[in-house]
Amino acid sequence: MTATATEHVAATSGATGRIARVIGPVVDVEFPADAIPSIYNALTTEITLNGETKTITFETSQHLGDNLVRAISLQATDGLVRGTSVVDSGAPISVPVGDGVKGHIFNVLGQPLDVTESELDISERWPIHRKAPAFASLEGSTEMLETGIKVIDLLTPYIKGGKIGLFGGAGVGKTVLIQEMITRVARNFGGTSVFAGVGERTREGNDLWVEMEEAGVLKDTALVFGQMDEPPGTRLRVALSALTMAEYFRDVQNQDVLLFIDNIFRFTQAGSEVSTLLGRMPSAVGYQPNLADEMGLLQERITSTKGHSITSMQAIYVPADDYTDPAPATTFAHLDATTELSREIASRGLYPAVDPLTSTSRILDPQYIGKDHYNTAVRVKQILQKNKELQDIIAILGVDELSEEDKIVVSRARRIQQFLSQNTYTAKQFTGVEGSTVSIKDTVEGFTAICDGELDHIAEQAFFNVGGLDDVERQWAKIQEQTK
């Protein structure tokens, strides 16, 4: 007998079913006809493996008919057998919210990983599946979020209350830049931060935990992890768990919140795995047919309401450096600012390896950032673009064959490229150089001076991996001293 909508309404928490089939993380469960769980309901069962009893949680994903539901396990299914009883919780997965989550690490189910549940002061839990804020309650923002990183503040200014994407292939510095942003923005921000580790390395999660503790921001931060070794169902839902915690701070405590997600591609990848496990026909390049829908359900909840904001910074892995891949391409449409990391720039040792010509921002406009800032950003991009166009001629004929005007362009472009690099706090352990923060005023003045030719007398190596113009002058004095 196939369950009907009327019978779904009758389903209540505590209804018990039995496992009919287990295929990896996919579990089919048979329930009584009048107690079919709703889609997204959490199901639980207890198993004993190697003398240890543990609870396994599933999420209802499909109604198959004949009283069967298909669920995705959020933990390893080792030890599950047919006939094991399963209990319907009657509600979706929920996570703890409120001040009690600050300073702690949680998994997708809201279970603490650093302390026992009895040590937490939790009075409220929210379901992770929630509607986006009503259209009338939304509020746009054009206020710039200053980071102190020259290349970002000048060419791809971030928006307070906006969605920011850090795009890049493997090994170009996405996670380091996210960690740098946490160190800089969270420390200066003074509000609440939530970090979602989606399908990334467990080692990086531990590094982040230690760095946040050292930076003094851990006490105001909640961390939610679903790492690489977790089942796809966990990796698909962990971003929603973290977002739910952030929404509570925004909607109930009326706070401005920072939400860091690393990595959105792993969220998409987990959705593709779950879609395949559920037997859906794949779409382009093997991704799930509802890729845009899944991305929209997440991104539309990351928004600012009247008076309060969620500012999100999301790392997005670009497979094979292909920006036309459906995963990064689907994410682009939701973002207010995009920072694209270049393998070619990283190969020259220039960090952060931000591509100044392809990175964008919605507020790179004189009415939002001022005429001086905008004009300097445009001049910098024009010089870099002209230099890029001249590279083929230089490769064939050499720099000496260029016109005097073009030689000046190339010379200033090289200084700009070096000056866009900057020593960061996160990289100090590798470089031994203290990080620097440059105000937007000093950044604009510095690049204006380069574009105007005021610094043509300074060797380009003096601009490498420094902060403001004062650092350039000190570096230049050192170079002159060494060459005497």
UniProtKB/Swiss-Prot annotation:
Residues engaged in binding ATP: 168-175
Matches recorded under CDD domains: ATP-synt_F1_beta_C, ATP-synt_F1_beta_N, F1-ATPase_beta_CD
Highest taxon listed in the record's lineage: Bacteria
Subcellular location: Cell membrane
GO molecular function, one term: ATP hydrolysis activity
Keywords carried by this UniProt record: ATP synthesis, ATP-binding, Cell membrane, CF(1), Hydrogen ion transport, Ion transport, Membrane, Nucleotide-binding, Translocase, Transport
Location (main, coarse): membrane
Broadest EC class assigned to this enzyme: translocase
Enzyme Commission code(s) on record: 7.1.2.2
Entry membrane topology: Peripheral membrane protein
Reaction(s) catalysed (UniProt annotation): ATP + H2O + 4 H(+)(in) = ADP + phosphate + 5 H(+)(out)
SUPFAM superfamilies according to UniProt: C-terminal domain of alpha and beta subunits of F1 ATP synthase, N-terminal domain of alpha and beta subunits of F1 ATP synthase, P-loop containing nucleoside triphosphate hydrolases
One Gene Ontology cellular component: plasma membrane
Similarity comment: family membership: Belongs to the ATPase alpha/beta chains family.
The protein's assembly and partners: F-type ATPases have 2 components, CF(1) - the catalytic core - and CF(0) - the membrane proton channel. CF(1) has five subunits: alpha(3), beta(3), gamma(1), delta(1), epsilon(1). CF(0) has three main subunits: a(1), b(2) and c(9-12). The alpha and beta chains form an alternating ring which encloses part of the gamma chain. CF(1) is attached to CF(0) by a central stalk formed by the gamma and epsilon chains, while a peripheral stalk is formed by the delta and b chains.
Its biological purpose: Produces ATP from ADP in the presence of a proton gradient across the membrane. The catalytic sites are hosted primarily by the beta subunits.
PANTHER family: ATP SYNTHASE (PTHR15184), ATP SYNTHASE SUBUNIT BETA, MITOCHONDRIAL (PTHR15184:SF71)
Stated name of the protein: ATP synthase subunit beta
Native source organism of the sequence: Pseudarthrobacter chlorophenolicus (strain ATCC 700700 / DSM 12829 / CIP 107037 / JCM 12360 / KCTC 9906 / NCIMB 13794 / A6)
